[in-house]
Amino acid sequence: MPTSKRTAAIIVAAGRGLRAGTGGPKQYRTIAGRTVIARAMEAFCDHPDVFAVQPVLNPDDLAMFNQAVAGFRYRPPANGGATRQASVHAGLEALAADAPDIVLIHDAARPFATPALIRRAIEATDITGAAVPVIPVTDTIKQVDASGAVNATPDRAKLRIAQTPQAFRFDVILDAHRRAARDGRDDFTDDAALAEWVGLTVATFEGDAANMKLTTPEDFVREEARLAAMLGDIRTGTGYDVHAFGDGDHVMLCGVKVPHNRGFLAHSDGDVGLHALVDAILGALADGDIGSHFPPSDPQWKGAASDKFLKYAVDRVAARGGRIANLEVTMICERPKIGPLRDTMRARIAEITGVAISRIAVKATTSERLGFTGREEGIATTASATVRLPWNDSDQEDKGWST
């Protein structure tokens, strides 16, 4: 159930990531086909309890950032500082004009935060107003002196590995950062340490072993292999839809209102592009078709906007732990002309689905004046969707459609 707390998230992405090797800042490198920052931001942008996502960037990275997160919802990026601490402070100040109750501070180099982890972070602020996710230390830790000689073996039962997102009451962590800035303290490696410095009691909550920070080239190799193994079930589905023209002054195509001298005869808004995409995604899941989930006999779908149907299909993929790898739609019509609107349609599909625009294709063709599309009696559309799901041997059994 959604929380009543107004929660915002800061995604700290201003670092250069030199230890990760060549290839530019690590947050813009790809892992299993998607950028690290897109993976890091997605869980927060899609979370129902997070009303605002505030990125903090190196201003030189803005073009890379915009390309990586096309279609996501987020506030205008804030410029980062010389240290992580300064960058977080910049993000907090950017949120101050519309101050949330709770702020989650997350490193862009941790691309595997889950909705459940985010929910635990929000709930943990009820304890002391400051909380950090932790996981147990499983290795024996040695404390050494300047020469490298062991001088202590800490009790690992009392040690924890700290992660992000770290969660705070917004007012107290903003005040803590302002105090540190006034006192010239810029040496805190995480926000929990800064909170401790001002006297806050920092609670802990259950982290996630998979929510590891990508730091070295070996980290990228390891996580690439892990994701490939997790999403090894590659599915392809196809969709097809047709609507005849009727009275009206526009048609909806791929979520875009297109002026036209006719409208569609349809139960919903008649968006043939989105309807075909819904069928393609459901087909990849072996999960029925659009009519089985949204029957035209049901009056609640009368005049409904088709973006609802597409979001539903995308959520079905997410519920299976999957990712959409590619979406393609081809419209067959004489008019309206699709070419001038192609990129607008791609951007709209990206906005609805959260899929990167680089993974979305919109095409158009004619039937050379043959058939009903050639006579301009309507529009036909085909679509395909490629979906990656976690491999599950039990899926080899024929269990029928899920409805």
Swiss-Prot record:
Keyword Nucleotide-binding: no
Pathway of action: Isoprenoid biosynthesis; isopentenyl diphosphate biosynthesis via DXP pathway; isopentenyl diphosphate from 1-deoxy-D-xylulose 5-phosphate: step 2/6; Isoprenoid biosynthesis; isopentenyl diphosphate biosynthesis via DXP pathway; isopentenyl diphosphate from 1-deoxy-D-xylulose 5-phosphate: step 4/6
Pfam families, per the entry: IspD, YgbB
Binding positions for 4-CDP-2-C-methyl-D-erythritol 2-phosphate per the UniProt entry: 241-243, 267-268, 289-291, 365-368, 372, 375
SUPFAM superfamilies named among the record's database cross-references: IpsF-like, Nucleotide-diphospho-sugar transferases
GO molecular function: 2-C-methyl-D-erythritol 2,4-cyclodiphosphate synthase activity; 2-C-methyl-D-erythritol 4-phosphate cytidylyltransferase activity; metal ion binding
Positions of region (2-C-methyl-D-erythritol 4-phosphate cytidylyltransferase): 1-234
Cofactor: a divalent metal cation
Record InterPro entries: IspD, IspD/F, IspD/TarI, ISPD_synthase_CS, MECDP_synthase, MECDP_synthase_CS, MECDP_synthase_sf, Nucleotide-diphossugar_trans
Catalytic activity, EC: 2.7.7.60, 4.6.1.12
Keyword Lyase: yes
Site (Positions MEP for the nucleophilic attack): 156, 213
Annotated site residue numbers, Transition state stabilizer: 19, 26, 267, 366
Annotated stretches, region: 2-C-methyl-D-erythritol 2,4-cyclodiphosphate synthase: 235-403
Catalytic activity: 2-C-methyl-D-erythritol 4-phosphate + CTP + H(+) = 4-CDP-2-C-methyl-D-erythritol + diphosphate; 4-CDP-2-C-methyl-D-erythritol 2-phosphate = 2-C-methyl-D-erythritol 2,4-cyclic diphosphate + CMP
GO process annotations (BP): isopentenyl diphosphate biosynthetic process, methylerythritol 4-phosphate pathway; terpenoid biosynthetic process
Residue numbers binding a divalent metal cation: 241, 243, 275
UniProt keyword terms in alphabetical order: Isoprene biosynthesis, Lyase, Metal-binding, Multifunctional enzyme, Nucleotidyltransferase, Transferase
Described function: Bifunctional enzyme that catalyzes the formation of 4-diphosphocytidyl-2-C-methyl-D-erythritol from CTP and 2-C-methyl-D-erythritol 4-phosphate (MEP) (IspD), and catalyzes the conversion of 4-diphosphocytidyl-2-C-methyl-D-erythritol 2-phosphate (CDP-ME2P) to 2-C-methyl-D-erythritol 2,4-cyclodiphosphate (ME-CPP) with a corresponding release of cytidine 5-monophosphate (CMP) (IspF).
Sequence similarity: In the N-terminal section; belongs to the IspD/TarI cytidylyltransferase family. IspD subfamily. In the C-terminal section; belongs to the IspF family.
Protein name: Bifunctional enzyme IspD/IspF
